[in-house]
Structure formats: structure tokens, C-alpha cells
Amino acid sequence: MPDVLDASPYDALLLLSFGGPEGPDDVVPFLENVTRGRGIPKERLKEVGQHYFLFGGVSPINDQNRALLDALRKDFAEHGLDLPVYWGNRNWAPYLTDTLREMVGDGRRRILVLATSAYASYSGCRQYRENLADALAALESEGLELPKIDKLRHYFNHPGFVEPMVDGVVRSLAELPAEVRDGAHIAFCTHSIPTSAADGSGPVEEHGDGGAYVRQHLDVARLIADAVRERTGVDHPWQLVYQSRSGAPHIPWLEPDICDHLEERQAAGVPAVVMAPIGFVSDHMEVLYDLDTEATAKAEELGLPVRRSATVGADPRFAAAVRDLVLERAGDERGQEVTPCALGTLGASHNLCPVGCCPARAPRPAAAGADSPYA
């Protein structure tokens, strides 16, 4: 039997994710949830939903999250961590409010949250904290006893997140034809966001020049590129690029776009490209459509050999990293001296999001941070 690990004062872990449709009839209602309050016509949502309809109306994120749940529960059981794991989403079933209600009914009073976003940004962190505040407000209106909720820190530079991506890039390089392999360029891909949102990401002292969002991605890209060089003996050129832009064309977003980048690399004589989706925990629709479908078609049009490396997904090392993050935060809550595990130059991220971190355009209550209205 494994030694019993102590997660106290926490009595549950909540996997908090974006959500996605499970069939064609779910696509438009799901997109209505995503775009709530923006007044987008249903016909326009049907056009946007074509990405999902190409895959039978099913988002891959749901099965990815189910696999991650299984991996977490397996890892926790094998290592003596008695901590039940629940799952709730922002935009589709299982909805966050329903899951929190279930957790309260099960007697959970101290909850840790793992968001399926590794980096600092409004949509990847604070918006989830706003969702938590909304859910707590709903439970409060029902007269339920509210649990205390904390959120695990950003884990972009934890070895259990970085090392599986290194393996993925090395495998993708090996899949390229031998004659182009050593000259291959690595395009580290992440979700584009408005430059104003990037500049405001992270704590106030990190605002500007892309903010924490860009700096964290660059740190991970360097870590992976350095590790790939050590593994292969080849110093592959690389660049951080962006994908999945949306919104009004006059609003500046982070660039270059992956398809534009492929055109530029081909024109510069690059013989092959590996696309490494470091901004995504698992194979979201943005990975399957924007990279595997759209960007891959662009590469074929250009005659440019291209491979897409694997996301972390339910890799056992990532499940072990989550266990490590849980124990780290639990020890810190108990007042113990804890040494956080982090690679790169930026160090471990904060446990508690400070006031002014990743601000919204219109201020809203956000739980699990220094500015939380819930104790």
C-alpha cells in the first residue's frame, strides 16, 4: 500500500474547463453560451459552428477531459492521495454551478480548482474565477453553505507539463523525411488574444509588452527548444506564433498567425515545420481544426512538409504534476515551508491571484483571488 499523502485542508479537486458540444444539436446552444451577451444572430453562430459540424458536432475536449479525470484518479489512488476529483465546465454540461452544487451536497467544504489553462490571461484565469464567483452566488441564493475555493497556480513551467511536450516535438521531428529533418523549424503555437488583453495579463507589475501571457509562452518555448537540442543534437530555429483569432478585424491581436507564418517560412527556404501547440493542455477544436485541418492544408498548398506534435492531454507525468501542485498548495495552506517545482527563468507562479491581475474590461466579482468577495 502506498503511503497516505496529506491534501488537508482540501477535501476535493475540481477540474474546471471550457466545455464543448457532444453532438450536432448542441453546437448552436453551446456557441450561444460562449457568446452570451454579445447579441450574435443564430445564423451567424451556425456559420461559426461549421468547425464543429466537420467533426460530427462533437468537441474533442470532453473526451480529453474524461481521460484526464481517469488519469488523475488513477494517479491519486496509486500514490495514496485520498482526494475525490469532480468536473465542471464554463459553457456546457457538466456545468460548473451544477458540479459545485453536487460537491456541496457531498459535504465538500475546501475545494481546489485545476483549470485546463496553464498560462496567465483573462480568458484562461480570471474569467474562470468570475465563473466560480457566479456559481457561488447561485448557490448562495439557494441558501446552501458555501465551500471555500482556491485555485491551483499556473503550471506552464512545471516539468510534468513541459516534458511531455518535449517528447512530442522530438517524435514529430523523427516523423519528418530524413532529408528535411535537421533543417526543420519549430512553430510554437498558442491561442491569439487581443494585444490589450495580453498586455494586461498577469500581475500589475508584469503588464505591458505582451504581459505575462507572452513571457510565459516564450519561457516554455525556450525550455522545449533547449531540451530538443540536447536530445537530438540539432539546434532547430523556432518562433512563438498564434492561431484561432476571432473578433473584429480592426482590433489588434497577437501575431503572426500560423498560416501566415508557414507562408513566410516557406518563402525563406525552410524545408519543414513542426507545429507544437504549447498553449493547449489537450486536443481542443482549435488544435484539430486550426492546426490539423487549416494550417496543414496551407502547408500542403505550399509544398511544405509539416507535422503537429502532441498536446499533454492525459499523460501520466501531467497527472503526477497535478498531484504535486495539490500537495504543494496544501502544505502552503498548513503553514509548511514548500519549495515549488518550476523550470525556466520565471519561477513558480503566485498561489493567489493579486488585485489587478488579468483585469476584465468591465469589472466583475472573481473568486479564489486576493480580490474575492468570498472568504
UniProtKB/Swiss-Prot annotation:
Taxon lineage: Bacteria, Bacillati, Actinomycetota, Actinomycetes, Kitasatosporales
Protein's name according to its UniProt entry: Coproporphyrin III ferrochelatase
One Pfam match: Ferrochelatase
Cited SUPFAM superfamilies: Chelatase (SSF53800)
Predominant place of localization: cytoplasm
Domain of life: Bacteria
Pathway info: Porphyrin-containing compound metabolism; protoheme biosynthesis
Record keywords, A-Z: Cytoplasm, Heme biosynthesis, Iron, Lyase, Metal-binding, Porphyrin biosynthesis
Reaction it catalyzes: Fe-coproporphyrin III + 2 H(+) = coproporphyrin III + Fe(2+)
Similarity section: Belongs to the ferrochelatase family.
Signal peptide start and end residues: none
GN (gene name): cpfC
Sites where the protein binds Fe-coproporphyrin III: S59, Y128
GO BP annotation list: heme biosynthetic process
Binding site for Fe(2+): H191, E286
Gene3D superfamilies named in the record: 3.40.50.1400
Enzyme Commission number(s) of this protein: 4.99.1.9
Protein localization: Cytoplasm
GO molecular function annotations of the record: ferrochelatase activity; metal ion binding
Organism: Streptomyces coelicolor (strain ATCC BAA-471 / A3(2) / M145)
Protein role: Involved in coproporphyrin-dependent heme b biosynthesis. Catalyzes the insertion of ferrous iron into coproporphyrin III to form Fe-coproporphyrin III.
